[in-house]
A protein has these predicted regions:
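N-terminal activation segment of mature serine protease catalytic domains
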Residues: 1-25
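Cleft-lining beta-strand/loop regions that shape enzyme active-site pockets
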Residues: 1-5, 28, 37, 58-62, ...
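PDZ/PDZ-like peptide-tail recognition elements
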Residues: 11, 23-61
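A short, compositionally biased
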Residues: 44, 51, 101-108, 267, ...
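A generic structural motif
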Residues: 51, 110-114, 288, 318
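Short linear motifs in exposed loops
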Residues: 61, 90, 123, 283, ...
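Polar, glycine-rich mid-to-C-terminal structural blocks
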Residues: 241, 253-254, 258-260, 264-323, ...
Length: 428
């Protein structure tokens, strides 16, 4: 049998990735458009998140001011067909591909509105959609502002600057909270420019070190807020560029960090062309923040199969003001805060979309009633309805204790500890 050149390149590149680290990735031509969306935050489409509910795909969040929003599409509206093709049974990726296209082209979308069940066919002109990197900016107390930053796509620095300037126009700014929780990172240069909003021109933010030498990234403009008190929120989902912003502000004693230890992704990623319009996203170095510490949590260089070992906090470094900080394993906050406990069962319900399903149903029943998010509380009757709706669904869930018992049983059988099996059986 003949093997195509495309397949040979794909097999070879995939094998390279398996031997190096989990971030080295082969990107064939058909995946490059998704990669571009992740890095630029822009695509041609109608401007909405979508999700699956049963056999159908529904609109999960039309972006404010997007073509979908202007066409009257609301959260929970069901997609019946796209350009005459029934959407029943389709996966999210299939419907997403149909909705996307070149800007200024028309897509015909047949929908069923959630609130009144009315069926409508909309002719929507696609536009160049920019996914907002700053989904929220507002006030949490007199003089204290809060900005949520979700990812480091192209142009997010300008978004951050505009958000700050808008807050300054609204009132006196006495302090600012930057929320980088669950921000997975993105473009390094955007992170450097954001740090430059709060630090003097010429400040070193990060340097990269690899086989081809090192490169130093410094701020290039006068700061917008050189002295404003800053607090930065992080958690174990804060990674890469988010860790660079948080870690550099900590090293420069420019902000206080609160939350949980960050993820620990301090690897430099570069894209190399392979031919046939395919690319290899390759790890080429590591990031080092101003104190000299590296934030990478896993060392993949010492394992033949690219599995890696955890980096133990081993070396002490000093912040600009002389405080002691440690390398390896991500960024440790100045003020550790325990995360709010959420059971694995609740997380499973959320991941499967069952909670959003109930919210849609709730809105359908109560959309005409006055609603104040600051005082809203779910009634006992509504909670019972929610519980019954979950009981009617199949939830593929296994408790942590059940999983631990299964692992104990496997270990006992593998090591021929027959005498333990009876004791394990009593626990089941």
């Amino acid at each position: 049998d003949e093997v195509s050149s495309d397949d040979l390149v794909a097999y070879a590149a995939h094998g390279i990735g398996l031997r190096l680290d989990p971030y080295t990735q082969y990107l064939p031509e058909e995946e490059m458009s998704e990669f571009d969306i992740l890095t630029t935050g822009k695509y041609g489409g109608v401007g909405s998140l979508i999700r699956k509910r049963g056999e159908w795909i529904i609109f999960a969040r039309p972006y404010e001011g997007s073509p979908a929003d202007r066409a009257g599409i609301r959260i929970g509206d069901k997609i019946l067909a796209v350009d005459g093709k029934s959407a029943q049974g389709m996966e999210i990726s299939e419907v997403s591909s149909l909705l996307k296209g070149d800007p200024n082209t028309i897509v015909k979308v047949k929908i069923q509105h959630l609130l009144d069940d009315q069926i409508e066919t909309l002719h929507i002109r696609r536009e160049r959609i920019a996914i907002p990197g700053i989904p929220y900016a507002g006030w949490v107390a007199p003089g204290i502002a809060y900005i949520q930053h979700s990812d480091f796509t192209e142009g997010c620095y300008e978004e951050m600057r505009r958000a700050i300037e808008q807050l300054q126009a609204e009132g006196e700014l006495k302090g600012l909270i930057l929320d980088y929780r669950s921000n997975g990172g993105g473009i390094l240069q955007e992170a450097v420019k954001i740090v430059g909003l709060f630090t003097p021109e010429g400040t070193e933010v990060v340097r990269t070190k690899g086989r081809e030498g090192e490169e130093i990234f410094c701020t290039k403009e006068s700061p917008l807020l050189p002295n404003l008190p800053l607090a930065v929120l992080i958690n174990n989902g804060s990674a890469s560029a988010a860790e660079i912003v948080a870690g550099s502000l900590q090293d420069l004693d420019r902000a206080v960090l609160l939350g949980q230890k960050s993820f620990g992704k301090g690897l430099v990623q570069s894209t190399l062309p392979l031919g046939y319009n395919a690319y290899l996203k390759l790890t080429t170095g590591k990031y080092y923040i101003p104190s000299g510490r590296c934030i990478q949590a896993i060392d993949y260089s010492k394992h033949a199969e690219g599995k890696g070992y955890e980096v133990v906090d081993s070396m002490a470094f000093r912040t600009l003001g002389g405080r002691e900080v440690w390398d390896g394993g991500g960024i440790t906050p100045d003020c550790p805060l325990a995360p709010r406990y959420i059971s694995n069962f609740a997380l499973t319900l959320y991941a499967l979309g069952f909670i959003e399903d109930y919210v849609d149903d709730y809105m359908k029943r109560h959309h005409s009633e006055p609603f104040d998010p600051t005082t809203f509380a779910l009634s006992d009757e509504e909670y019972e309805l929610f519980m019954r709706s979950i009981e009617e669904k199949e939830v593929p869930y296994e408790s942590a204790s059940r999983k631990m018992l299964a692992r104990m049983k496997e270990a006992a059988q593998a090591d021929h500890f027959e005498e333990l099996e009876a004791q394990i059986a009593q626990l089941e």
